[in-house]
């Protein structure tokens, strides 16, 4: 988000200007001057800055708070292996958000940022890629740290569309690209499997909005999780519905088909619990029990 545009779209949907999904928005991510995603416009370089930034996004109507704990891959000069905030700043972000009744998500690529985010009380880790601090190593997976994440109850979101969608059976990628992606995929497979084995709560996400990752291709991530990561179709569906709903504190409202919950429903042609690609054959979309799309009327 830049300029709180997602909150404006959310308001337009709520006011009935056009149909759309249920949007839960964080507004611009809180980062540092010259930090990852600095061009989104919300910088914080001290404890007071962090406190002010959290209060500011909540004042504007954010549903939750996002802080960019480590550098990232798509910002020139940013170092994804290193923390951008001090442990004290991360604690202030979490405590201030929680005081205001909001949960906090942390963009987290480097292993250096995991312990400070754990100690700060961050609610969800986005990516959690275990990138090594030393550039001589690519990744640094630490089982005891993973067990600590599991014990804390933190949910980790894995973005599995991006590079990996070109490895799906119906895609054709240049051979050189496939070789590079396969190497990355094998490393991801190992970390993903170990995190699941050690009991970390996992949710599937997309990082949609970045180059090459479209909002309408979310299902590709579920297919990658099943085809390449060894998840069952039903586990992948739960990791993109029930688990994230619970991670957002909305498990009593959405995420499962239970009497009394909001009727946010997608119906597909086929049995997605057996064949994950059935999710590509959408026949009905409902929000709050109201039909937004029906294949029978779309034509």
Where are these predicted regions, by residue range?
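Divalent-metal coordination cores built from histidine and acidic residues
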Residues: 1-102, 145-175
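Active-site glycine- and acidic-residue-rich loops that bind
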Residues: 2-7, 41-51, 105-108, 129-143, ...
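Divalent metal-coordination and catalytic microenvironments
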Residues: 23, 61, 65, 97, ...
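His/Asp/Glu-enriched, well-ordered alpha-helical/loop segment
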Residues: 99, 174-176, 184-271
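Glycine-enriched alpha-helix->loop->beta-strand junction motifs that scaffold or abut catalytic
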Residues: 118-124, 150-155, 172-176, 198-201
């Amino acid at each position: 988000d830049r300029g709180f545009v997602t909150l404006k779209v959310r308001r337009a949907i709520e006011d009935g200007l056009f149909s759309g999904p249920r949007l839960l928005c964080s507004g611009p991510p809180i980062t540092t001057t010259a930090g990852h995603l600095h061009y989104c416009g919300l910088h914080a370089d001290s404890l007071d800055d962090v406190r002010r930034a959290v209060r500011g996004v909540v004042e504007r109507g954010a549903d939750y708070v996002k802080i960019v704990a480590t550098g990232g891959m798509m910002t020139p000069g940013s170092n994804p292996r290193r923390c951008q905030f001090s442990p004290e700043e991360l604690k202030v972000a979490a405590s201030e958000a929680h005081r205001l009744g909001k949960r906090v998500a942390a963009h987290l690529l480097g292993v250096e940022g995991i312990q400070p985010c754990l100690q700060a009380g961050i609610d969800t880790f986005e990516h959690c890629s275990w990138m090594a601090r030393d550039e001589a190593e690519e990744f640094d997976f630490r089982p005891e740290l993973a067990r600590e994440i599991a014990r804390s109850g933190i949910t980790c979101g894995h973005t599995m569309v991006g590079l990996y969608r070109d490895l799906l059976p119906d895609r054709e990628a240049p051979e050189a690209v496939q070789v590079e992606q396969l190497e990355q995929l094998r490393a991801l497979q190992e970390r993903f499997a170990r995190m699941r084995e050690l009991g970390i709560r996992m949710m599937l996400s997309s990082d949609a909005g970045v180059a090459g990752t479209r909002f309408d291709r979310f299902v590709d991530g579920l297919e990658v999780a099943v085809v390449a990561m060894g998840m069952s179709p039903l586990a992948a569906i739960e990791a993109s519905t029930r688990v994230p709903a619970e991670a957002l504190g909305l498990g009593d409202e959405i995420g499962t088909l239970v009497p009394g919950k909001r009727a946010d429903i997608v119906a597909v042609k086929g049995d997605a619990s057996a064949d994950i690609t059935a999710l590509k054959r959408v026949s009905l979309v409902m929000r709050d029990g109201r039909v937004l799309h029906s294949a029978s009327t779309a034509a």
